[in-house]
Amino acid sequence: MANPTATFTTSLGSFTAEVFSDTMPVTAGNFIALARSGFYDGLHFHRVIPSFMIQFGCPYSKDPNDGRAGTGGPPHGTIADEHPSNARHSNEPGTLSMANTGRPNSGGSQFFINTVHNTYLDWFTPGPSKHPVFGRVIEGKDVVTQIE
């Protein structure tokens, strides 16, 4: 069975991502449930760092002037970190990666799209601050570049 896709409609155009429900069922399932519930509707990319990533998923970002943008999470709380040995997806350009607070099991609704290869964020490399990849942009990469 093919992995599901998600289409993001922005003021700069649309892009589509494949969601790795086959290898990242917890993280992908969390994202899909939030998307289907309408949680992500009307949100803005609240953190854009050129030559690094663009971040999305904070409920406070509906108002881009809200000082809390970037601090919110989903109504159900956080999810467990997912590090399956058969899913060593690297934080390559165009991949969707779960954001967290730097503590274990602190991911929830916020995720980012890598715009460069950020291998040091891969959960399977040594060091702190690990972010599991759960999808990749398959159409509209030019829109991601415009947002950046």
PLM segments and residue spans:
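Cyclophilin-like peptidyl-prolyl cis-trans isomerases
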Residues: 1-148
